[in-house]
Amino acid sequence: MMFGNGNGNGNGNGSEGPGESETGRLEAFSDGVLAVIITIMAFELKAPAGHDFSSLRERIPALLVYILSFTFVGIYWNNHHHLLRAARRVTAGVMWANLHLLFWLSLIPVLTEWIGEHYRDSVPTATYGLACLGSAVAFTILVRAIISADGSASLVATAIGRDAKGRASLVTYAVATGLAWVTPWISYALFVAVAVMWFVPDRRLSRP
């Protein structure tokens, strides 16, 4: 889900309400974890062994996987930011759902390195697909936890509705994971397709 955020906090005096303070702390914690995840991925990039183009060419698959993973994490950071800006309450369920999402995202750096070195093999590709699927499921759980906390008439609940794009992502990741055992290249194409789909702006939670 790609959400928009507003400028005001709804209390008219510019001060921060209790709910916004809670969601702000949760967002700050999550931002820190996501920053570490991206940093680890960058540290795991290896320079070409030689000084010619053939050495660089050998590292292109790993670089492409890094770009895909960076985009993947970046999309979740963007969506997570807008989702928490729209949320009003942070319950224990929301906190655990948020940690569940961060768990799956924390697997991305090690899987990025693995698949970058073995991009032709089914097991690393399928495992990467499982991490993508797990992250998508975890984000859906987080959304539902926020709706449960804020109520069925909340902004998040009203705006998201049946969430066709989210459901399509879950199905695509599941298919990509299964097809990794046939040919990893189809899986990569599906991973990219999901990323492209989420690049299209979705302003369901935009505020004036």
Enumerate the language-model features and the residues they cover:
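Multi-pass alpha-helical transmembrane bundle typical of ion/small-solute transporters
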Residues: 2-8, 12-208
